[in-house]
């Protein structure tokens, strides 16, 4: 993701792994894209050969500003790392960076371009955050690095690099923008703000499990309705299915095993060849106001909860 602490994380990785074990993709023709990636990914468009070369040379990291689906099939989902930043701060910082390093563009034009408002959500391309190895938060960099190191068995050291000297001026709240512009930006960033809030909750969960000395389970509720609840659950490097407990209104409803094949998770190289899904159909459909929750049986980690909407008197 552009302007989300990537430079700091990259430098930490270079220090830990060495330049020879790090590859980068910042796009076609970008001088920071490494030669091997330029040759095999962009020129030959042969990702299979690229993966072979990376494995042969024991490359530790492939990083860059790339939509996740581009390289996700090459690596286990539990080894994929992304960082998100507060959407307005990312937008303002990215615009300032583009104006410094490339052709300056008015803010009103920039926010409508592909690299403008909502770029973080677009680069993730609807991939569930809970399926990734680590989703860090720029504003919580130290906590994110702690989770990253613990999850992947690393010892990366914190770096603070590539900061705009006028960073404080960029961290303006939304209401300081001109009224018409503020409304427009608010609408463009609505989905990304929800994604950012979700990523923060996920980081909270990871920290809680880390502090408790408990293993973290990747997982989430993907769908819930009056008739059924479904989702996925898995652990990194684990081949046996995760056992789950489903509750309805705080009472046990069912014990589940996450064994069902999910094509989307298979494409992401989730453990168990993507056989990590669960589904439960309610014998008695949920009623308005009913709540359900799914937790990991072994640790009590909450994977998700949902409440059946209550219709107002004016709704049909």
Q: What is each stretch, according to the model?
A:
Residues 1-228, 250, 314-316:
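Membrane-interface amphipathic segments in extracytoplasmic regions
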Residues 202-316:
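Basic, ligand-binding patches in group-transfer machinery
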């Amino acid at each position: 993701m552009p302007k989300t602490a990537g430079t700091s994380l990259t430098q930490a990785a270079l220090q830990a792994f060495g330049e020879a074990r790090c590859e980068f993709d910042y796009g076609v023709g970008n001088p920071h894209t490494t030669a091997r990636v330029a040759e095999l990914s962009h020129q030959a468009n042969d990702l299979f050969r690229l993966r072979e070369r990376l494995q042969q040379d024991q490359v530790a990291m492939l990083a860059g500003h790339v939509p996740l689906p581009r390289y996700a099939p090459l690596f286990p989902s539990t080894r994929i790392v992304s960082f998100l930043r507060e959407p307005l701060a990312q937008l303002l910082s990215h615009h300032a960076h583009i104006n410094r390093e490339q052709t300056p563009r008015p803010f009103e034009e920039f926010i409508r371009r592909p690299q403008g408002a909502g770029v973080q959500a677009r680069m993730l391309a609807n991939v569930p955050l809970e399926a990734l190895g680590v989703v860090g938060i720029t504003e919580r960099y130290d906590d994110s690095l702690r989770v990253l190191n613990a999850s992947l068995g690393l010892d990366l050291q914190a770096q603070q690099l590539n900061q705009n000297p006028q960073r404080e001026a960029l961290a303006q709240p939304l209401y300081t923008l001109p009224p018409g512009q503020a409304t427009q930006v608010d609408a463009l960033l609505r989905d990304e703000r929800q994604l950012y809030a979700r990523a923060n909750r996920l980081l909270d969960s990871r920290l809680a499990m880390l502090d408790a000395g408990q293993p973290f389970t990747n997982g989430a509720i993907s769908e819930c309705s009056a008739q059924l609840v479904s989702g996925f659950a898995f652990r990194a490097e684990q081949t046996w299915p995760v056992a789950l407990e489903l509750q309805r209104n705080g009472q046990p409803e069912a014990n589940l095993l996450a064994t069902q094949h999910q094509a989307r998770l298979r494409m992401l190289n989730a453990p168990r060849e993507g056989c990590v899904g669960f589904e439960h159909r309610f014998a008695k459909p949920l009623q308005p106001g009913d709540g359900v929750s799914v937790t990991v049986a072994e640790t009590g980690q909450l994977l998700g909860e949902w409440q059946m909407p209550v219709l107002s008197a004016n709704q049909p």
